Amino acid sequence: GYARQKQFAMSLCSNEWVLNLDGDEVLNPAIIASFKRIIEINEADSVRFLRNDIFIGKAPSNFAKKPNNLRLYKKSKSTFNNSHLVHESAIVDGKEVFINESFDHFGYGSVSVITDKCNQYSSLKSTEKFLKNKRYSTLKLFLVFPLTFIKTYFFQRNFFSGNRGLINSIAASYYAFTK
């Protein structure tokens, strides 16, 4: 899985601080400046920050809730859980700080791309659950789609992003159902 790849890549890093980005993710000058300050001060072991999911060519509304990610961390304090086949994140033993800066993720250029990713990730996630002997629940299958839609569309305020927010919320609900 991806966790093993990321653990191996981290072992090859020659610097203490590791920035974990995918090929479709881009930093801006403001977040880079924040990283430099945090590294200079050296009072944290990891940094959590916001992600702009650029969907069909546009960033989400400023009123929509953005996901946050732990992507900058000290190599000596971090590891990955190799049983995670998808949505892996570093596990850091130390002080975490949050900065109110964001990076852009260009992974969802069209509805077909987001659908393909939902199918790919849900297959990996269901394999992961199978390997851990997790059983499915009929009640959960019945409830997960509508509850995920309510959470993403209303509580995460995706409705502020118009049709893109509606499509994104439906895709998130579909993913939650199929995994």
Where in this protein do the model-derived segments appear?
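Alpha/beta-hydrolase active-site loop signature
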Residues: 1, 25
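Catalytic-site signature of metal-activated, phosphate-bearing donor transferases
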Residues: 4, 10, 28-179
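Active-site-proximal cofactor/substrate-binding loop regions of enzyme domains
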Residues: 15
